[in-house]
């Protein structure tokens, strides 16, 4: 962790620098900051996940995950056709965290069918933010269970997939689960649900 020359941290948490926290910089820190700002792949080297067997550890990206990250940074709109459980949500959390750290006034909205799911995804981002070296992240203005606001004006919030989700809000990046339409053969009723829930009813 970078040594702060002023002991100012959000709620006393040493992993949450306040906007006025200053650091004693060295050449390696300056180089890492610049490289992380320019390259999401370099930034991802500092991104931590929780491995079920080994606990907290830096993520090790597969080549296809690197390609997705590059596509996210190179293109405004992206559609990813992929199987389940290959780390798509993790990739989106890396992208969201990178953007709010290095873009001013950038707004991310995490959408899921249930609030608990959105909160769980946001917990991953909170963990990754806390595990970043302090010199890589803007200071914290607000740090809550359902949202994060940084000193550079960027923020992340959560929402459920309701008909009026985020209505009237200005959002730069929206991430969410894939939703499919399924017709019940017996009743004829049409259901909309996340892909991950389809397997549960088959």
Residue spans for each PLM region:
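Phosphate/NTP-binding elements of NTP-utilizing enzymes
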Residues: 2-176, 182-201
